Amino acid sequence: MPNPADRVRELEFKLGSVEGPFPGHDLTGQARCINGVLQAFLGPVEPGQKIEAVPGSNSNVPLWILGSSLFGAQVAAAYGLPYGFASHFAPQALDDALATYRANFQPSDQQKTPYALIGVNIIAAETNEEAEYLATSQQMSFANLVRGDRKLTQPPIDDIDTYWTPEEKMRASHMLNFSIIGDADTVKRGVEALLARTQADELMIVSDMYDVDKRLRSFEIIANVLKD
């Protein structure tokens, strides 16, 4: 992705500020520019250097490539960077992208071996029925996306089929293909199956729910599952 002017200040803020409280693990600073400029800005200031990242200089924030296609996988492999795949909303090319990334990976100073992160939607609750109910908020959000009508997350409803058309259901469900919805046991089985399939090194978990307390509880259940 190019760096339009209106993103420069945002990138400067992210590249410097996120590394402070979360050293060594910056996903918001995923590489938008792949020609080495960011690596130079995040390293020590060299004599005669005319442009300095403030904050950011000498932070050595790790760069990532985030993608949803084979192109991103090829770029991450060529530059020896960690690769994050946006399978939480664009899962179509996941398997091919991971295979491409791993097969073509070139070691770099930052990363000696391939390191893959994948996005996954997980909505966990005390029961499968409650989780399915809570998941309707995210399903409505994707139906609205299909309609071109972006809205804030809506409260869950009893019957999602009253909200979307068959075509919207098909398209939204395809985008949400990488979703695990259920109680702790269901989530555990789903995560194990996903890791067995992808051999991912890390998961980026999205738990998009209307009720903040329910969302926090979802993450608690997920955390307990992953500890086991």
Label every PLM stretch briefly:
Residues 1, 63-66, 83-86, 114-121, ...:
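Hydrophobic faces of well-ordered beta-strands that scaffold small-molecule active sites
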Residues 3-6, 89, 122-124, 209-211:
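Active-site-proximal loop/turn and secondary-structure-junction residues that shape catalytic pockets
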Residues 6-20, 79:
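Acidic/polar active-site rim loop that often engages polyanionic ligands
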Residues 15-52, 93-199:
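An alpha-helical appendage that flanks or caps ligand/catalytic pockets
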Residues 40, 75, 79, 100, ...:
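Alpha-helical structural signal in soluble globular domains
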Residues 57-67, 175-184:
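Active-site mouth loops of central-metabolism enzymes
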Residues 69-98, 102:
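A conserved active-site cap/scaffold subdomain adjacent to cofactor or substrate pockets
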Residues 195-228:
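Generic C-terminus detector
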